[in-house]
Amino acid sequence: DDETTFPCNSGRCACLPEDSHSYTCQSP
């Protein structure tokens, strides 16, 4: 889901690995 996942270099938030190929954007 592009609205809730971003590459780790997004910079807008802390990106936590959700699985082997996606990341969840979480406010720091």
Swiss-Prot record:
Example of a GO MF term: toxin activity
Where is the protein found, in the record's own terms?
Answer: Secreted
Tissue and organ distribution = Expressed by the venom duct.
Query: What is stated about domains?
Result: The cysteine framework is IX (C-C-C-C-C-C).
4-hydroxyproline PTM sites in chain numbering: 17, 28
Which UniProt keywords are given for this protein, alphabetically ordered? Disulfide bond, Hydroxylation, Neurotoxin, Secreted, Toxin
CC annotations in GO: extracellular region
Modifications the protein undergoes after translation, according to the UniProt entry: Contains 3 disulfide bonds.
Q: Report the source organism.
A: Californiconus californicus
Presence of keyword Disulfide bond: yes
Question: What protein name applies here?
Answer: Conotoxin Cl9b
